[in-house]
């Protein structure tokens, strides 16, 4: 009987495709491993897939030793990726393709505001007690005359965000989340050197990699409305989001190296077993002594 109930349950639960996507700008500490573990376990619970993506688009800060340490930590704790590991640095042609698509369809545009102009705009808004945001100077609109294109400024690419209404989604941890659309503004999706920005590449990759469920730290909650703008502009489906509380230091701030947090492999060097680290990370899920 119980086996039949389990089989019915497994058929009804949608197989989740999840991921963990660290940036190799430093080591992976216990907080990151915990988030990865939640993502891994959710995929396995639903007979789905867990994927690993290395977000290495920041050439100035990337650290090859950090990449190796991340991969070693995942191997040690027994959380292998179910698919080939993706590296964002190898996907720039893909990002350019979708940026060009947005430009061609009128969902993105070139902005020629200089750094000095942007700084002056910010200073003016702050002096008026306003939230600093882009003012749409270069946003094309019916009946609007755009400024003359300057010779000395390489443009950035901005996506057209909605100017009215709300951006809403249901978070699997926090419930219904609503953001005023006019607080998102037309954010940059490609820098003046052509490099795509974080929120753009994350949304594109999650869509193309087939993510159904995105489990990540709640420090990414504010990124979600921007990523939803990208999903909608490109016609992608929006995954389910689960924003997990982070491990904090005694003062309530995000745990960091300054607080004595060590990298994942540091626990191995100290003689900890991977099973012990695994169980410690699962305490929030209700695992404890005797269970």
What is each of the regions a protein language model found here?
Residues 1-27, 47-50, 164, 242, ...:
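Non-catalytic terminal extensions that flank enzyme cores
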Residues 5, 11-127, 222-236:
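N-terminal Rossmann-like or analogous alpha/beta NTP/dinucleotide-binding catalytic cores
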Residues 20-24, 54-56, 204, 208, ...:
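Short, histidine-centered active-site or binding-site loop motifs used for metal coordination
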Residues 60, 88, 216-220, 266-271:
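Hydrophobic alpha-helical scaffolding
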Residues 81-82, 109, 215, 267, ...:
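Short, polar/flexible loop-turn hinges at active-site or ligand-entry regions and domain interfaces
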Residues 109-110, 114-243, 248-255, 263-264:
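Active-site cores that bind ATP or allylic diphosphates and position pyrophosphate for catalysis
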